[in-house]
A protein has these predicted regions:
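Helix-to-loop junction immediately C-terminal to a conserved catalytic motif
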Residues: 51
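Short coil-to-beta microelement around the adenine-binding A-loop and adjacent beta1/P-loop entry
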Residues: 17-18, 117
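Conserved hydrophobic segment flanking the Walker A/P-loop of ABC-type ATPase nucleotide-binding domains
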Residues: 27-28
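ABC-family P-loop ATPase nucleotide-binding domains
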Residues: 2, 67, 73-131, 138, ...
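The feature captures the beta-strand-to-loop junction immediately N-terminal to the Walker
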Residues: 36-38
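Conserved beta1/A-loop at the N-terminus of ABC ATPase nucleotide-binding domains
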Residues: 5-15, 61
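Conserved structural motif at the start of ABC-family nucleotide-binding domains
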Residues: 5, 19-22
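Catalytic Walker B motif of ABC-type/P-loop ATPase nucleotide-binding domains
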Residues: 147-150
């Protein structure tokens, strides 16, 4: 089976600090990979290079042409003026009766406590943790090949 994403001899440096040095990695469908390390050790950088947010300084990153992927990072925030429903439900392009009867959507919204926040609540009124849950829910309700969490 072909990998969803491949990193081949990838390197990345910020200033004088080399965070990635000749990293090679393949991610297959169904893989669950955890990356651990010290603060400033390159974990987020690896994920950003892996997902195309940042280009590598050297090496190659490739992925399947039809890869459906979501990235939930600590660095990106949601626009304050959007409601929770606009962030999570609208991208699905489903009518209310369709998503409300969708078990996956209901399970994600209930499991992450999103329903308790209120779907019409503006994102700008949410705490940082609530925003992260909304961002995570927006990724998990989609039909994706790969979800990357930072």
């Amino acid at each position: 089976m072909a990998n969803l994403i491949n990193l081949e001899q990838v390197s990345k440096t910020y200033g004088l600090k080399t965070l990635l040095d000749g990293v090679s990695l393949g991610v297959q469908s169904g893989d669950r990979i955890g990356i651990v390390g010290v603060n400033g050790g390159g974990k987020t950088t690896l994920l950003e290079v892996l997902t195309g947010i940042e280009p590598p300084d050297a090496g190659r990153v490739s992925h399947t042409s039809d890869l459906r992927m979501a990235v939930v990072t600590q660095r990106f925030d949601l626009p304050d003026e959007l409601t929770i429903a606009q962030v999570i439900i609208e991208p699905l392009e489903l009518e209310t009766y369709e998503w409300a009867s969708n078990a996956k959507v209901r399970d994600v919204l209930g499991g992450l406590g999103i329903v308790d926040l209120g779907l019409d609540t503006p994102v700008g009124s949410l705490s940082g943790g609530e925003r992260r849950r909304v961002n995570l829910a927006a990724a998990l309700v989609q039909d994706l090949d790969l979800v990357v969490l930072d």
